[in-house]
Amino acid sequence: PSNSSAASDVYKRQTNPTLYARTGGKLDDFHNHIKRICEIVDGPVSAESVAMTRDEIIRDGRELAALADNVVVKIPTMVEGLAATKALSEEGIPVNMTLCFSVPQAIMAARAGARYISPFVGRFDDIAEDGISQLADVVAAVNNYDFGHDVEIIAASVRSANHVTQAALMGADIATVPFAALKKCVQHPLTDRGLDAFMKDWEKVQQA
């Protein structure tokens, strides 16, 4: 969660094992941590299962979904995850399939019943591949089909204002944006320059 009240207008929140580890949180407090986030966020909150088998992921998913009405269960895009996603979605539990890096993965996630699919942008850039192009391919491919349920694409691993811009242009439904990048999205040097000029001109009016 952000330390700024401005973040209260963000539509969706995400967690994953790495983000939680960075908080220094304890395993025993993880569920309480998710509950606290859900209490302050009006929209969906993605909470990730760390299980590796179908049955264990389903068990985790049910436990996470029981924490709050706005929990979305995050599941890695893998064979066991696809099977668990199908089962959970049939129970009415929304799933966000994460760690998606290809069009075939995204299509299979949607067919399994995933409500959200999270292709990672920044991690492609880390290995000198174009993450935005990969995101565009996923968006285009998923939009080609009617899966019989709503599917939204989350641009994940977004690291800059340019990533946000490109994700919007490519048609991603949602972007997960760290607070530092979110602040940069609001800032522009011409805005600062214009505001400075306005204030100086207003001072002249006051002194007239």
Which residues make up each language-model segment?
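Single conserved hydrophobic/aromatic residue that forms the stacking wall/gate
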Residues: 1-7, 11
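Catalytic cores of alpha/beta
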Residues: 8, 56-60, 104-111, 159-172
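Active-site beta->alpha loop and helix N-cap motifs at the rims of alpha/beta catalytic domains
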Residues: 8, 15-87, 121
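Glycine-rich phosphate-binding active-site loops on the catalytic face of alpha/beta enzymes
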Residues: 13, 17-20, 117-127, 172-191
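Conserved, mostly hydrophobic/aromatic
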Residues: 16, 73, 109, 167, ...
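Alpha-helix-loop-beta-strand connector modules within alpha/beta enzyme cores
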Residues: 31-45, 82-91, 132-149, 200-201
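Catalytic beta/alpha-barrel core
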Residues: 46-52, 70-79, 94-107, 118-128, ...
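C-terminal alpha-helical cap/extension of soluble enzyme domains
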Residues: 142-208
